[in-house]
Amino acid sequence: MFLRQFTFALIFFQLIISCSSESKNDVIESSLEQNNVAENVTQFVSINPGTTGVFTFKPTGALSDKSINVYYHTPQGDLTNFPILFSFHGGSRNADDYRNDWIEMANDNSFMVFAPEFNSLDFPSGDMYNLANIFEDGDNPSIDTLNSPDRWTFSIIDQLFDFIKSETSSNETSYNAWGHSGGAQFLHRFVLYMPESKLKTAVCSNAGWYTVPESGVVFPYGLLESQLSNSKLISAFSKTLYVHLGELDTNPNSSSLRHNIIVDEQQGLNRLVRGRYFFETSKKKAELLNVNFNWIKTPEVSGVGHDHSEMAKDALKYILE
């Protein structure tokens, strides 16, 4: 009798412990599920006047698997009538710094600045950022490896602009853009390959090397195998593009500056001479085609080398024109 009572009590006690443990586990699992949901939701704060922050943008379409942190600043005032500036980072992918370059100027001149970060996970190497995924391998282009335009990294920019317009109820129908170093590479190719975009003014500062509108030189350095039509090129020449160079950006051994027999013989050994070559050759191409040429080479920035903050300060006047 005693043994039966003891066995019953032991079973009852185990049932209580089991129920308690299951209940505790349910709570833990529920908590983990809630945390996972919270972590997977895009943490986005509405774009309000007078704010500095970051949000995550997910493009639609062929690049919907990509994720872009967008660092931004808005001045105080009516956002609906403020111009929109995109600031494109270089190879360091430090988009926060490229936003910060513009904060004071944005406040003083009443425009919004957005600096998208093309992270190295979703946009690895120069193929996905500097060369915008135009080809599967930008250094070995062919008609067979040409990606469709909806897979080009360029295709994200107008989408992002439309998203910002929606979030701010903006009345703007176009945007301006500034890029430095790798960002200037991305931006001048954006003008070449997507002249139909909503971009109004592009300021390209201190690009390391260029896709030059030059026949007989293979892409990514020239037009050969570029799959860039004359009609696109003519439209690109009609856009407003500033070639913006620091007079001291002359170090041929600068970090990440591309060197090979093609680009060195074609464009020169440093960023300054390469920028000059890009502009002069582009101008000659437009003259050869007898078409409108709205590209402008600005005065070279005195006392400044490869410095994005100083170049941004000088670029302001061209953004405001």
Residue ranges and their predicted role:
Residues M1-T7:
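Bacterial N-terminal signal peptides that target proteins for export
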Residues F8-I16:
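Bacterial N-terminal signal peptides
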Residues C19-I84, D96-D97, D108, P149-W152, ...:
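A domain-start/cap signature at the N-terminus of enzymes
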Residues P59, K66, Y71, T80-S174:
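Serine-hydrolase catalytic machinery in alpha/beta-hydrolase-like enzymes
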Residues F86-F88, S205, V301:
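Alpha/beta-hydrolase
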Residues E117-L121, G208, V304:
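Short beta-to-alpha linker loops that shape the active-site pocket of alpha/beta-hydrolase fold enzymes
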Residues K200-K284:
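The feature captures the conserved acid-bearing segment of alpha/beta-hydrolase catalytic domains
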Residues R276-E321:
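C-terminal catalytic histidine-bearing segment of alpha/beta-hydrolase fold enzymes
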